[in-house]
Amino acid sequence: MVFEIPEPYQWDETFEVFYEKLDEEHKGLFKGIKDLSDSPACSETLEKLVKLIEDHFTDEEEMMKSKSYEDLDSHKKIHSDFVETLKGVKAPVSEENIKMAKEWLVNHIKGTDFKYKGKL
């Protein structure tokens, strides 16, 4: 299923997973992608986004592991594939790559992360 990309591109309550730390981190990821969209030529902004994403994925995966979440391995693979894709992107970042990142985050939260609601 493909979910609608919000405009303006920002987190709202429809993305809530009901774990405060993860919701706050998701808000930061939306902001990081928006910042990159606003400054696609800035390699520093791209590097900050990659770091934010890696840190969030680590936190999320640690929560999953601590609760023996059954889909941890497949979730980690989805994360690592996205990080690998992002690390292949260079500044200036194309509109196509910004769109890809926006769509990936929205679809990942609503299509994949929502599966762990109430399980962590």
From Swiss-Prot:
Q: Got a GO cellular component term for this one?
A: cytoplasm
InterPro entries for this protein: Haemerythrin, Haemerythrin_Fe_BS, Hemerythrin, Hemerythrin-like, Hemerythrin-like_sf, Hemerythrin_metal-bd
Cellular location(s): Cytoplasm
Positions of Fe cation 1 binding: 26, 56, 60, 113
What molecular function terms (GO) are annotated for this protein?
Answer: iron ion binding; oxygen carrier activity
The family database entries (PROSITE patterns) matched by this protein are listed as: HEMERYTHRINS
Binding residues annotated for Fe cation 2, in chain numbering: 60, 75, 79, 108, 113
Q: Which controlled-vocabulary keywords does the entry list? A: Cytoplasm, Iron, Metal-binding, Oxygen transport, Transport
Q: How does it assemble?
A: Monomer.
**Similarity annotation:** Belongs to the hemerythrin family.
Q: What does this protein do?
A: Myohemerythrin is an oxygen-binding protein found in the retractor muscles of certain worms. The oxygen-binding site contains two iron atoms.
| Name of the protein in question | Myohemerythrin
UniProt organism field: Theromyzon tessulatum (Duck leech)
